[in-house]
């Protein structure tokens, strides 16, 4: 098993690591290269007297290196995998240090399986109930304060709100964090950026964006007041939006959904001092969409995940919520993609209807994944729309994805030129996130190949991953 060059480059934690990894992808720099199954290893000269020892499991993918880098994978791990992608490393007997790493991975996997089968430790239900009630009280107080703040803001009007400094919004967000409602705090912190943004294609005008953001906050607040009137899954979705974590006990009781999951794309974002990675998947048999989110820090790297363009053969467990989307990996393995398709892709009209149905169930959602079949990408000229402007944006979107049933504006993105070049005017299948105004593409299928947007938004070139 080998990963493609594009799949490996998409694993890079940032643009500098990607470039540095390519610099290490020269076989002459490596010594003691070898392979055992999906595991490869080698040694490369570093800054010290002893070479760095690097080992990687392509099935993870996962890697380990003796260099001092805190990035994962480091440039040496990327370089080793790139060497194998260019020309498969020959089989060999693993040295002691590589064998020890392989054995350690097997031991940890076995231990995790054993822990999963162990009966849960007894819980102090009284203490747990006390902690739960204390949080409910703090969140309730935070909701009261947010309600008053929103009413005051609306009395003064959106024009006054647009003139408020960042500190005005940050103070409210800080009080929501203190009230243990981090989901609401994140939304409040995003509001000044909406108000100050310049008009751009595939997005509402700044004042409309601010009004929409405040409206979603108000709807979420109202839903949070009526949890008892909602179904258990709907209530769980509201609580997740407020920032309540899903406990291990809750996830242990969730059913597994087995399928061959096509990994369409990765997306990496920086949130405060955390690195958040989303892995977007769709079931080849079920057509179910899934988003697996992992967090990492400088001292705690992101866990391994299947690369974009691979298939994950196994099970996911979906977190409670309506509609379901967030999931976690259960048992399974990554492997080559069966074929480059976007399961469940449909027309633009069908995608609009699906988005509307989803929004009706959870109107505070900010965006939702959509799949389009055989759409063309291009500039939407005034002549094509009878000279009309978009009533929401006030101007025509620069580019759109469309078919005979309609079109969706493409959100502004520095990677769009690469996307348009790959599409080359041909009908393509497209996967992306839609917010009601613009579609933000993440993956494209054309000519029997899957192309993914780079995980890092700063990387401008689309990657052929399958």
Language-model segment annotations:
Residues 1-466:
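Long, low-complexity, compositionally biased intrinsically disordered regions
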């Amino acid at each position: 098993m080998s990963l493609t060059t594009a799949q490996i480059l998409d694993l890079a934690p940032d643009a500098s690591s990607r470039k540095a990894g390519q610099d290490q992808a020269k076989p002459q720099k490596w010594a003691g290269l070898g392979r055992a199954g999906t595991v490869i290893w080698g040694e490369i000269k570093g800054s010290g007297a002893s070479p760095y020892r690097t080992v990687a499991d392509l099935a993870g993918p996962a890697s380990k290196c003796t260099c001092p880098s805190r990035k994962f994978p480091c440039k040496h791990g990327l370089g080793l995998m790139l060497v194998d992608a260019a020309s498969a490393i020959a089989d060999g007997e693993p040295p002691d240090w590589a064998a020890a790493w392989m054995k350690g991975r097997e031991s940890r996997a076995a231990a995790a399986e054993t822990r999963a089968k162990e009966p849960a430790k007894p819980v102090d239900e009284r203490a747990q109930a006390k902690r739960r009630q204390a949080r409910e009280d703090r969140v309730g107080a935070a909701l009261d304060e947010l309600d008053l703040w929103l009413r005051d803001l609306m009395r003064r009007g959106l024009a006054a709100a647009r003139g408020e400094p960042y500190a005005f919004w940050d103070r409210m967000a800080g009080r929501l964090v203190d009230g243990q409602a981090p989901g609401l705090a994140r939304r409040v912190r995003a509001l000044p950026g909406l108000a100050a943004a310049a008009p751009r294609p595939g997005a509402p005008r700044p004042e409309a964006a601010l009004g929409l953001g405040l409206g979603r906050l108000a709807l979420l607040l109202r839903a949070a007041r009526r949890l008892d009137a909602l179904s258990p899954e709907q209530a769980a979705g509201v609580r997740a939006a407020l920032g309540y974590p899903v406990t291990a006990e809750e996830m242990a009781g969730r059913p597994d959904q087995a399928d061959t999951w096509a990994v369409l794309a990765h997306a990496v974002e920086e949130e405060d001092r955390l690195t958040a990675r989303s892995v977007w998947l769709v079931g080849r048999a079920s057509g179910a969409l899934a988003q697996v989110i992992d967090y990492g820090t400088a001292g705690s790297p992101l866990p391994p995940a299947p690369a974009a363009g691979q298939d994950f053969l196994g099970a996911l467990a979906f977190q409670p919520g309506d509609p379901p989307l967030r999931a976690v990996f259960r048992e399974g393995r990554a492997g080559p993609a069966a074929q480059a398709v976007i399961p469940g892709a449909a027309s633009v009209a069908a995608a609009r209807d699906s988005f509307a149905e989803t929004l009706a169930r959870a109107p505070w959602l900010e965006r939702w994944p959509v799949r389009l079949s055989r759409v063309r990408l291009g500039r939407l000229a005034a002549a094509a729309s009878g000279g009309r402007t978009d009533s929401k944006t006030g101007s025509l979107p620069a580019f759109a994805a469309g078919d005979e049933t309609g079109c969706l504006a493409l959100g502004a993105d520095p990677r769009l030129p690469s996307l348009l070049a790959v599409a080359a005017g041909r009908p393509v299948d497209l996967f992306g996130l839609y917010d009601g105004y613009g579609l933000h593409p993440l993956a494209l299928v054309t000519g029997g190949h899957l192309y993914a947007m780079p995980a890092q938004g700063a990387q401008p070139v689309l990657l052929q991953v399958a």
